[in-house]
């Protein structure tokens, strides 16, 4: 038996909303026959596209087989046959739209960061709980092949006692001149529009650290706006008011130390745009978006510092690939299936808006640390 579930998808005219959420998740789920449920039935998503640009919505609809679309959020929310509201639009507008959807009784699934402020994010979580609707936040990094292999190592005890985690994320985002358009929208570089790499990436680092290694207990951060001006989508030069690089340190539960560099102003000399090294007493691993490599204690070379002679050790040769041993689906699609299944069955969904609140909280405290030039404790949230 097939069951329909209507999904209002706000923000699909943007790059992530279109490519990852609509095309590679919802439409791919439809193409594959829906989401299989424990009772043998199948849940089939039926999206309606929501946005402000009628021309773009019509073009997307036509490209993908005549999908439903609309430009009036109130009208879309008034349809009782569409029971899920998804938001991947501008962060600054998310609270207003999500609260409106909660009031209409819709289940909520949204991109991170869920808000620009912890207080606003908490209002969304509290409202969703009080309304009794299911709610979730996108945490795609947890479902990437490289991270899932790393989680397998942690669960197996490969590292022994984990000592430290070091992450490098970023790439050069073109300024918009020299005939090279920027790979990110201009609002990302305007603080007043909800931009900034701390707000964007520390939400990722929070759930990645919390769910893989241990709860973040304190943070120390500094950041910068390295590129003072850029060229926007219309060819106009504008001032950058948001941070484009951040350098964070985190103390985790279990006496694990982590440090992450996040930058839109760095040129890549590593295997992937994001790489994370984990060091433990028994072994180490380097994980990227898709690959993961390990070096056990017994395979660790014994270098001796001597800058007067050429290095004789090829350090990369001493690392072993972790095999897939499974088929890895698109990370966004995996989490969409989990959320839709949780709505249909009532089963727990751990990646709720409260988890999204924690990401905003860490970003806010990191910004405070940067401005006050000190370590800041990260308190537990009152979710009652």
Regions found by a protein language model. Give the residues of each.
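Glycine-rich, N-terminal phosphate-binding loop of Rossmann-like dinucleotide-binding domains
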Residues: 88-89, 370
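Beta-strand-loop-alpha-helix segment that lines the small-molecule cofactor/substrate pocket
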Residues: 83-84, 90, 95-142, 157
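Glycine-rich, aromatic-lined ligand/substrate-binding cores of catalytic
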Residues: 200, 208-219, 223-231, 236-284, ...
């Amino acid at each position: 038996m097939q069951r329909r579930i209507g999904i209002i998808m706000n923000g699909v005219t943007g790059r992530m909303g279109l490519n990852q959420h609509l095309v590679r998740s919802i439409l791919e789920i439809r193409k594959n026959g829906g989401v299989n449920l424990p009772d043998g039935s199948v849940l089939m998503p039926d999206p309606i596209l929501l946005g402000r640009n009628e021309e773009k919505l019509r073009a997307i609809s036509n490209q993908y087989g005549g999908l439903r679309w609309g430009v009036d959020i109130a009208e879309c929310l008034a349809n009782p046959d569409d029971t899920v509201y998804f938001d991947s639009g501008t962060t600054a507008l998310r609270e207003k739209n999500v609260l409106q959807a909660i009031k209409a009784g819709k289940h909520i699934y949204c991109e991170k960061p869920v808000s620009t402020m912890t207080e606003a994010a908490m209002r969304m979580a509290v409202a969703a709980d009080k309304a009794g609707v299911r709610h979730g936040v996108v945490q795609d990094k947890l479902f990437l092949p490289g991270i899932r292999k790393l989680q397998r190592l942690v669960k197996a005890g490969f590292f022994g006692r984990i000592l430290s985690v070091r992450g490098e994320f970023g790439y050069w985002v073109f300024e918009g001149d020299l005939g090279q358009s920027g790979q990110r929208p201009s609002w990302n570089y305007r603080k007043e529009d909800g931009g900034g790499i701390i707000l964007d990436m520390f939400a990722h680092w929070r759930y990645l650290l919390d769910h893989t290694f241990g709860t973040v207990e304190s943070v120390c951060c500094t950041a910068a706006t390295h590129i003072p001006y850029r060229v926007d989508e219309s060819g106009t030069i504008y001032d950058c008011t948001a941070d484009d690089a951040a350098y964070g340190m985190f103390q985790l539960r279990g006496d694990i130390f982590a440090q992450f560099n996040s930058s839109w102003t760095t040129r890549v000399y590593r295997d992937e745009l994001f790489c994370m090294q984990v060091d433990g007493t028994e072994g180490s691993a380097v994980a990227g978006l898709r690959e993961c490599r390990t070096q056990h204690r017994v395979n660790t070379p014994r270098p001796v510092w001597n800058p007067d002679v050429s290095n004789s050790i090829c350090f990369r040769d001493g690392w072993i690939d972790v095999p897939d041993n499974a088929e890895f689906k698109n990370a966004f699609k995996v989490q969409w299936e989990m959320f839709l299944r949780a709505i249909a069955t009532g089963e727990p969904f751990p990646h709720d808006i409260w988890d999204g609140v924690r990401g905003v909280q860490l970003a806010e405290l990191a910004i405070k640390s940067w401005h006050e030039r000190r370590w800041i404790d990260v308190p537990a949230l009152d979710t009652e």
